[in-house]
């Protein structure tokens, strides 16, 4: 669509006393973005400082960090001996938030959208803004000697300056609603990130997602255990208390459909799926429904790997 379509959407939403919350991705950009193209053209110039560019080591990447979608976090900068860093796909180079010019450009962009009439944002992968600038090897957790980047990125004790700048210069002046996609903080620090005194209005409760993990790879889950799931939800609710109105979520774009996870195989019927829906809306907090969840959508079945579009699935295959 065109910008005129968005303007019309915002106008009609406000006329109906509704609000538009957009996805906001500020941890990385596209490798087709003019900033990155300028960095490729002149790595030593201004825009080379907008990214993490490092020389290789022993003929390979600067360290052993493994990207979220598989493979190294480092790819060779075209036409250069330098490597650029990416938490996710190689087409998504990470922005250098240590650079005040990057932060200024991001804040200007966020305010542009808020001035246009957007009412708030879901902040994607926001915990990834802070890096350990030493970029040292991590403990290998895979037979190939690599270490999951998720173990090396979270520097939540030092990320506050970045998030406070966004709140102070963008969110507060516009009374914007914000929800953070924050996977790695402890329960004790929830109020630091969400609520009136936190960086965001609220944050997603992923505790019961993480309780099912049993390895460094995305597909390594324990068999579903009701008590573990229940306890994780209760702990998050009790810990949030009156400080944070959590964003409750049972499924999202990174996860299979809820009936396929939380219901015994063959037991996903109208009544059981409706019970999951009741959980979504009756817990204290803000219910977030992923598209299709409102009709109890189930997982699709794909007979061949060619039918999958998911990067992780294809890479693992």
Task: Name each region found by the language model.
Residues 1-317:
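Active-site and adjacent substrate-binding regions of carbohydrate-active enzymes
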């Amino acid at each position: 669509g065109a910008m005129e379509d968005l303007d019309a959407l915002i106008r009609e939403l406000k006329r109906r006393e509704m609000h538009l919350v957009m996805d906001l991705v500020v941890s990385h950009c596209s490798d087709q973005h003019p900033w990155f193209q300028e960095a490729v053209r002149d790595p030593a110039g201004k825009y080379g400082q907008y990214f993490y560019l490092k020389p290789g080591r022993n003929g390979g990447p600067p360290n052993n960090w493994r990207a979220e979608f598989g493979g190294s976090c480092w790819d060779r900068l075209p036409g250069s001996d330098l490597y650029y860093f990416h938490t996710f796909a190689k087409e998504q180079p990470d922005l250098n938030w240590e650079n005040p010019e990057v932060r200024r450009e991001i804040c200007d962009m966020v305010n542009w959208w808020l001035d246009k009439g957007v009412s708030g944002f879901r902040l994607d992968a926001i915990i990834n803004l802070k890096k350990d600038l030493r970029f040292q090897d991590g403990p290998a957790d895979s037979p190939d000697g690599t270490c999951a980047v998720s173990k090396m990125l979270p520097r939540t004790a030092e990320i506050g300056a970045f998030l406070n700048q966004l709140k102070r210069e963008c969110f507060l002046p516009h009374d914007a609603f914000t929800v953070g996609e924050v996977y790695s903080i402890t329960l004790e620090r929830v109020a630091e990130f969400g609520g009136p005194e936190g960086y965001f209005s609220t944050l997603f409760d992923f505790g019961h997602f993480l309780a099912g993990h049993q390895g460094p790879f995305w597909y390594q889950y324990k068999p579903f255990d009701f008590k573990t799931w229940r306890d994780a939800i209760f702990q998050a609710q009790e810990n949030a208390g009156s400080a944070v109105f959590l964003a409750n979520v049972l499924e999202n774009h990174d996860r299979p459909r809820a009936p396929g996870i939380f219901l015994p195989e063959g037991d996903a019927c109208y009544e059981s799926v409706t019970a999951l829906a009741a959980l979504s809306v009756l817990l204290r907090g803000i219910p977030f429904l992923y598209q299709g969840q409102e009709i109890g959508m189930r997982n699709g079945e794909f007979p061949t790997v060619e039918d999958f579009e998911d990067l992780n699935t294809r890479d693992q295959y």
